[in-house]
Amino acid sequence: TDPGHWVTAVWVTAAWQRGCSVAERNGDETALAVVGSLSQERGPVTVMCSLHPLGLGVPALPADCADYADVLAEPDMHWAEPVSPDELAWLPGITHADVVRVPGSGQRRLFADPEPGWAAVSNLLVAPVLGGGSTVVVTGATAERTARIAAEERTAPVA
């Protein structure tokens, strides 16, 4: 959806827990597309996320999309699937074994306007989960605002 939005981490981890692989863009094997509310991209099944900070619904949901906000009405259940280390976690070529080999980070790190892709997911999500650290993501802010957030959150910006 957007590398700087928390809902991206939710969908990536949800896919991995179900034994699915994640791709940055739709491809021939796409079963489900998860997109932001401004996206025109569609998959065989498309879930649209408003990207509202509190996860509110999409104000004008297209007829060919499901609204991510609908999951809030569902019970909290965890249905993790056993996953082989050799199965692909991120397309192309990143296995679940590769995911757990990402160096963990126990630091409090701030990322400003991260680019989409595996590098963002491994740094913003995987490294702090494996290392007990935390991530602050800032999007669309000025350098001054980013520096103020870094000071407030007691982090150092990561280039």
Give residue ranges: language-model regions.
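Short beta-strand->loop structural element characteristic of the AMP-binding/adenylate-forming
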Residues: 1, 8-12, 16-41, 46-55, ...
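Conserved AMP-binding/adenylate-forming
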Residues: 1-20, 106-126
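Anion (oxyanion) recognition and catalysis
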Residues: 16-17, 129-130, 151
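A generic local structural motif
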Residues: 23, 97-101, 122-123
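ANL superfamily adenylate-forming
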Residues: 33-105, 150, 154-159
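Compositionally biased, low-complexity linear motifs
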Residues: 105, 110-111, 137-156
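C-terminal structured interaction module
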Residues: 119-139
